[in-house]
From Swiss-Prot:
One of its GO terms (molecular function) is thiamine-phosphate diphosphorylase activity. GO terms for cellular component: cytoplasm. It comes from the Bacteria. 4-amino-2-methyl-5-(diphosphooxymethyl)pyrimidine binds at Q44, F45, R46, E47, K48, N79, S117, K146. Belongs to the thiamine-phosphate synthase family. Keywords: Magnesium, Metal-binding, Thiamine biosynthesis, Transferase. This is Thiamine-phosphate synthase. NCBIfam families: thiE. SUPFAM superfamilies: Thiamin phosphate synthase. Its cofactor is Mg(2+). One of its GO terms (biological process) is thiamine diphosphate biosynthetic process. The lineage of its organism: Bacteria, Bacillati, Bacillota, Bacilli, Bacillales.
């Protein structure tokens, strides 16, 4: 990845909205539309958990969400489902440590965006070796969204990775909301990933606007 590409990814990670049907009681399309109006910079379709859509239903929703992203020039990333990402010609794929092997995903998706969730320095180094364009780090804070989550580690891993001189783009993951987002950027992350702080907000547009403004102002102070 060239320096230019890396800078672009760092910008795109600023407010990284993640959502599936399990994360909102409203129509996902309406929530995403409002979040885009509020200024999210990347979107990940994560259709997991109890009652998650399967097969054609899942693909249909993904395609509709993708169209909204395309219209707004917001990168559309698929969580774990590599085949769906290929079928839709999505902008990228995000995988966790328990998902499909990152190196295999890179071979399948070519030069599309590849993100990998990481929980320690060794996993970060492995992700870089496997060809990741960015890493998600966390859980930074306690989260209700993922029931199988690892132990909370605050921003310590982000700080550690930056101290080791690793410049891979980083997005903080897990329990991040407006009132606790600033330390994530201050520690060296390029952005924050958000689920419920937008998807369960009464006003997703306003929530996204406030998060975008916060990230922008914190980055300006660095």
């Amino acid at each position: 990845m060239t320096k230019t590409d890396q800078q672009q990814i760092k910008q795109q990670l600023s407010v990284y909205f993640i959502m599936g049907t399990a994360n909102t009681s409203r129509q996902p399309l309406d929530v995403l539309k409002e979040a885009i109006q509020g200024g999210i910079t990347m979107f990940q379709f994560r259709e997991k958990g109890e009652g998650a859509l399967q097969g054609e239903e899942k693909k249909q929703l993904a395609r509709q969400l993708q169209v909204l992203c395309q219209e707004a020039n917001v990168p559309f990333v698929v969580n774990d489902d590599v085949q769906l990402a290929i079928d839709l010609d999505a902008d990228g794929v995000h995988v966790g440590q328990e998902d499909t092997n990152a190196e295999d995903v890179r071979q399948k998706i070519g030069d599309k965006i590849l993100g990998v969730s990481t929980h320690n320095l060794d996993e970060v180094k492995q992700a870089m070796k496997d060809g990741a364009d960015y890493v998600g780090m966390g859980p930074v804070y306690p989260t209700e969204t993922k029931k199988d989550t690892r132990s909370v580690q605050g921003v310590s891993l982000i700080t550690e990775v930056r101290h080791h001189g690793l410049h891979i783009p980083i997005v903080g993951i897990g329990g991040i909301a407006y009132d606790n987002a600033a330390p994530v950027i201050q520690a060296g992350a390029d952005g924050i990933s958000i689920i419920s702080a937008i998807s369960q907000s009464a006003d997703p547009k306003k929530a996204a606007e406030e998060l975008r403004a916060l990230v922008t102002s914190e980055k300006a102070l660095l």
